[in-house]
């Protein structure tokens, strides 16, 4: 009944940098050719959404509807769309897969040339918006904008998932869980029997812990200044939990003493220059791999002692799991349904969408791992 028509619905709009999100009635236009309109059922609150509101993400334009960790049901499709149909369960992808660019055609690559990092995704590919509010054009965020009851995304940024998937649980697989789990499985390629160190135990850091465990790591050292996170980290597979504030020496020295020769893989899941360097220094020379997972502020700079790299360490970065989302996310959902991992353990709070700012307050206070908003 709604196909081809403008839909009026609720969305959380960031009108300006630093202002709390405002739940507004917005108009969502029908999808154009190659686009999909999705009824969002559930969306997680990710630290990156907080970075958007605070103005820390480069190239985002205001006013904007944030949110990029959602799951929903296809409401209608534009001309030429073949991979999904109305009624399909889907997860929108904050990094698309056009399937045609040099990166999409490279089996080793995972980030499409059409991602936000090479050309901003504040408007749809035709450079117009599908959102309006109070007569004003509202920008998209990474083509997904899941803080809206209905959103429009290009077909290339939509992954069809198993119809048995519970959307209020698998929404995390759109960003937070897949980012951490994939950093261990796809980017680092953690080997059985190896040692790992994970800096930062938020939702993504704990997902790294889960990925390291599934990959067969024999020792997983979890590091955070909030001891309240240690019980959950151990439940998910960490063998050791340490707080840098308990030591009067650099944390990389503590890790070296614990292991005797540094770790095989280290992950920084915070987004701070100092902890990135500490994590790099915590992995061993010759074969140590450091993976940068946390998103640093857009003006951050890291200064590295060249000797750390000259002696053989590898410094890698990863986004949303280091794999092509249209393939990886459906596979992850299948693994979830097969109970290969339990990402539900990351969900500490479930709130109605109207309480979106309460969800951000829980994040700021360090009281939540993941809050899921339900429409």
From Swiss-Prot:
It is found in: Cytoplasm. Its main location: cytoplasm. Disulfide bonds: none annotated. Zn(2+) 1 binds at residues 46, 68, 175. NAD(+) binds at residues 200-205, 224, 229, 293-295, 370. PROSITE patterns: ADH_ZINC (PS00059). It catalyses: a primary alcohol + NAD(+) = an aldehyde + NADH + H(+); a secondary alcohol + NAD(+) = a ketone + NADH + H(+). InterPro entries: ADH-like_C, ADH-like_N, ADH_Zn_CS, GroES-like_sf, NAD(P)-bd_dom_sf. Zn(2+) 2 binds at residues 98, 101, 104, 112. GO terms for cellular component: cytosol. The keyword Signal does not apply. Its cofactor is Zn(2+). Its EC number is 1.1.1.1. One of its GO terms (molecular function) is all-trans-retinol dehydrogenase (NAD+) activity. SUPFAM superfamilies: GroES-like (SSF50129), NAD(P)-binding Rossmann-fold domains (SSF51735). It holds the Pfam family ADH_N. Binds 2 Zn(2+) ions per subunit. The modification N-acetylalanine is found at residue 1. Keywords: Acetylation, Cytoplasm, Metal-binding, NAD, Oxidoreductase, Zinc. Homodimer. Belongs to the zinc-containing alcohol dehydrogenase family. Class-I subfamily. This is Alcohol dehydrogenase 1. The gene is ADH1.
């Amino acid at each position: 009944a709604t196909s081809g028509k403008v839909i009026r619905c609720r969305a959380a709009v960031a009108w300006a940098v630093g202002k709390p999100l405002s739940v507004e009635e917005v108009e969502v236009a029908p999808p154009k050719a190659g686009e999909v309109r999705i009824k969002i059922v559930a969306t997680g609150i990710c630290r990156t959404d907080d970075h958007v509101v605070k103005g820390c993400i480069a190239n985002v334009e205001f006013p904007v509807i944030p949110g990029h960790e959602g799951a929903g049901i296809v409401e209608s499709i534009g001309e030429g769309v073949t991979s999904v149909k109305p009624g399909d369960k889907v997860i929108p992808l904050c990094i698309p897969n056009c399937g045609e660019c040099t990166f999409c055609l490279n089996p080793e690559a995972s980030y499409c040339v059409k991602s936000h990092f090479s050309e901003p995704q504040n408007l749809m590919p035709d450079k117009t918006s599908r959102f309006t509010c109070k007569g004003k054009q509202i920008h998209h965020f990474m083509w997904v904008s899941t803080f809206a009851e209905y959103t429009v995304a290009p077909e290339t940024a939509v992954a069809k998932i198993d119809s048995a998937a519970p959307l209020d649980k698998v929404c995390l697989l759109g960003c937070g869980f897949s980012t951490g789990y994939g950093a261990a499985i796809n980017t680092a390629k953690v080997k059985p029997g190896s040692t790992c160190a994970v800096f930062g135990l938020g939702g993504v850091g704990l997902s790294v812990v889960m990925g390291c465990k599934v990959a067969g790591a024999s020792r997983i050292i979890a590091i955070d200044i909030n001891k309240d996170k240690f019980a959950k980290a151990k439940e998910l597979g960490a063998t050791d939990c340490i707080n840098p504030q308990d030591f009067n020496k650099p944390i990389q020295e503590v890790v070296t003493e614990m292991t005797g020769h540094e770790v095989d893989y280290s992950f920084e899941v915070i987004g701070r220059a100092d902890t990135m360097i500490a994590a790099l220094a915590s992995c061993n020379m010759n074969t140590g791999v450091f993976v940068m997972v946390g998103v640093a502020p857009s003006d951050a700079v890291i200064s590295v002692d060249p000797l750390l790299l000259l002696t053989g360490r590898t410094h890698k970065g990863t986004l949303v799991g280091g794999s092509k989302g249209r393939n990886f996310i459906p596979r992850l959902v299948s693994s979830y349904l097969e109970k290969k991992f339990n990402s539900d353990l990351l969900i500490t709070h479930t709130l109605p969408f109207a309480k979106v700012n309460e969800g951000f307050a829980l994040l700021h206070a360090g009281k939540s791992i993941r809050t899921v908003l339900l429409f």
